[in-house]
Amino acid sequence: DVHWKADSIASEKAGERMSEVLDAEKPDLVIFTGDVIFGKPADKSMRCALEPTIKRGIPFAVTFGNHDDELGMSRKELYDFIKDMPGNLTSTVEGLSGVTNFILPVKASDGSQDAALLYVFDSHSYATLKGIKGYGWIKHDQVQWYIDESKKFTEANGGIPLTALSFFHIPLPEYHEAVQNEGTFLIGTRKEKACAPEINTGLFAAMKEAGDVLGVFVGHDHVNDYAVSWKGIMLCYGRFT
């Protein structure tokens, strides 16, 4: 979560830290896991939040959180705003729930074939069913899309699942289960209960069945900064900027 506010001194300082990290790490790709902006005007805040990455010529991708579309621009409008920015790899699947659902294949060193996959999901914003409170969840059609795409990649790879990671904003309910189990080992800092949705639509189970995703990376909970292995999949947080 960058939570960029245009013309905010705090955001400018955060931008300096982001620049330091980018210069030190020199990543091949940056993925923003939602709540990129938190101030109006939305377009200016978004451009400023992405600028340190764009300035360095580093490819990037964005998925949206629950706050991004609360600042005067819809998810689709934000997607259209960033789609032609230099280095942007964010994509969308027409007809699928949400906006920022896409797959980034990682090629083998010789560029001959896909060697790994990065699955990015739109985890939406808030609960939309009567009687259900809290945050939104990845919908059934998104889970089915993942199942179908994962199967295609596995079949194309001779029946062997391609190593994959997944990125979205709101943590899965399994983040709760993992930390409540005495047999798990948590690395990092946990200062609050994961603000996961009350509805579990089975994405974690689908990932286990597919056998490709080794790690899930989310944001959303600002004072959580940890990784925990649950049933063979690492459940991780990205640090709040």
Residue ranges, per PLM feature:
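Loop/turn elements at helix/coil->beta-strand transitions in domains of secreted/extracellular proteins
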Residues: 25-30, 55-61, 114-117, 159-164, ...
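Divalent metal-coordination and catalytic microenvironments
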Residues: 1, 18, 30, 35, ...
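Extended active-site neighborhood of metal-dependent phosphoesterases/phosphodiesterases
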Residues: 47-159
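Active-site environment of divalent metal-dependent phosphoester hydrolases
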Residues: 5-7, 38-41, 62-73, 126-129, ...
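N-terminal active-site segment of His-dependent metallophosphoesterases
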Residues: 1-52
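Conserved beta-sheet core of the metallophosphoesterase superfamily
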Residues: 182-241
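Active-site-proximal beta-strand elements of phosphoester/diester hydrolases
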Residues: 1-6, 115-125, 167, 233-240
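Short acidic, glycine-rich surface-loop motifs adjacent to enzyme active sites
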Residues: 31-36, 153-177
